[in-house]
């Protein structure tokens, strides 16, 4: 079975939080065997955030996106370039188009996660809302995180840091 190609579109809006979320998603997908292309309008944050890059993640300029892959993710409603959307509509089968929204614990998120949004192009866009309940998209979690958390020795870390534990 061939690996799916994922195109992630990201516009840096404020303090690089957007690219941080997209970078984590790109790394996670690549670690699962997907081919990932991150199309970003300001890659300067990656110079300090991920100076070595990540195996399986290709980074390109936002407006330089080529032929659409199998899945297109627009982070935080950033809309892929119009010419790219035209190529999406011409592709058979059409790619799955996902609008990745911000993390929220608000109750309304459960009602809109997974909703279809028909587009002028004839394509459907699907809302993906990360969240904290089974009715949302959940959270990204690095492999081994729970085991590392369980093995963490707070007292030893504090002692090694020259800090004393305080109750409260």
Where do the PLM segments sit?
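Positively charged, low-complexity intrinsically disordered leader regions
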Residues: 1-6, 130
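Residues that mark the start of a beta-strand
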Residues: 5-7, 167-168
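Active-site and donor-binding regions of nucleotide-sugar-utilizing enzymes
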Residues: 7-122
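A nucleotide-sugar donor-handling region in carbohydrate enzymes
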Residues: 102-168
């Amino acid at each position: 079975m061939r690996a799916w190609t994922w195109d992630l579109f990201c516009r840096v809006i404020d303090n690089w939080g957007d690219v941080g979320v997209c970078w984590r998603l790109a790394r996670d997908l690549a670690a699962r065997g997907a081919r990932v292309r991150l199309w970003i309008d300001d890659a300067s944050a990656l110079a300090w955030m991920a100076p070595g890059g990540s195996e399986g993640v290709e980074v390109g300029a936002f407006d330089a996106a080529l032929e659409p892959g199998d899945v297109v993710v627009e982070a935080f409603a950033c809309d892929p370039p119009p010419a790219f959307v035209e190529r999406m509509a011409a592709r058979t089968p059409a790619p799955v188009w996902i609008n990745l929204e911000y993390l929220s614990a608000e109750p309304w998120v459960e009602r809109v996660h997974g909703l279809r949004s028909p587009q002028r192009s004839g394509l459907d866009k699907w809302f993906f809302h990360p969240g904290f309940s089974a009715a949302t998209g959940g959270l990204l979690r690095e492999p081994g995180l729970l085991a590392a958390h369980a093995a963490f020795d707070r007292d030893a870390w504090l002692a090694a840091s020259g800090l004393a534990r305080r109750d409260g």
